[in-house]
């Protein structure tokens, strides 16, 4: 579909605002005293809403949602900051597979590094957060981001072990969901991905409109 001529208050815009809020808030975190964190969160969200959401009703609705999740975001961020320090925010990255003449590129929301040089990768979700089973079979986003990170494919990042990759749900159901590396190791998923790309490059492989059914129900 074509892009709308004028901005509309859709889920895409909401995602842009939420991602910008988290990026700016994390950058402000080191200079923000604990007692001032909620106020700073509200200030950043208000500035983004005023600049990008000119519809009063949507502005009021999104404002209430953002303020309602402020305490949860701050509490979760305090936990994350004890594990590692933010190293990459909204970073671009890529990994070249020369034997396949294929480049995997992506934008990662955030990568933290622990004192032991382990990497923690996070992706913000304003919609539904994929379950571990969905990630294992259908949604490989965290796996592919982690594979790029582990090979040092993102800007300002050296190769290192990805200890954990997780979705941070910022929607109505606030949720933290890690990738099931215990059920499917990252190295195994990466080999499967390379095999998939190699099979697609074969003249004998057709491109299916749907690889598998995501959900089956009566209606």
In which residue ranges do the predicted regions lie?
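RecB-family 4Fe-4S metal-dependent nuclease core
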Residues: 1-219
